[in-house]
Amino acid sequence: MNECDWKIRFGTAGTSDSFEAKGYKSSLDIPAYTAEMGLNAFEYQCGHGVRLGVDKAGKMAADAAERGILFSVHAPYYISMSSLEEEKRLGSVRYLLQSAEVCRALGGRRIIFHSGSCGKQSREAALEKALDTMRRAVEALDEAGYGDMTLCPETMGKIGQLGTLDEVLALCGVDKR
């Protein structure tokens, strides 16, 4: 077990206006920005798609490692684990795989995501679909060589969204690794 496995970390999810105000311009500057604030974690935002290349991510990872900063990745917001459309659920698995690739390049191991809405189905039916999609995602990660990655569903605040504490705990229970 290394230090990253147990150390409590504090960081931000993305950058604020202060990033540019302090003179930072590129995502390559994120480790310096994070360290300047005295933080040791950073959640890289891929909310609108995974657009960070692995080469650039590798450079960011090297700088972050020297500063004791650990990255995680927030997967795209358009994940829909419980969609009535099978293709959208399969797309959600693909988005998680893309996120895993960039997360690995950043030296991270946690992929944060929102599970999506219930749509026009009961919460119970939506949760069953989401649990199935989560199982598929875990299997896909393992098959693609990302078995060390942890999927981290977030709670959601709106009534129509899947993501109460109990629903998130059920999703987390899928991954037995």
Feature map (PLM): residue ranges:
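Active-site acidic/histidine proton-transfer and metal-coordination neighborhood
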Residues: 65-66, 82-177
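N-terminal pre-domain/capping segments
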Residues: 1-98
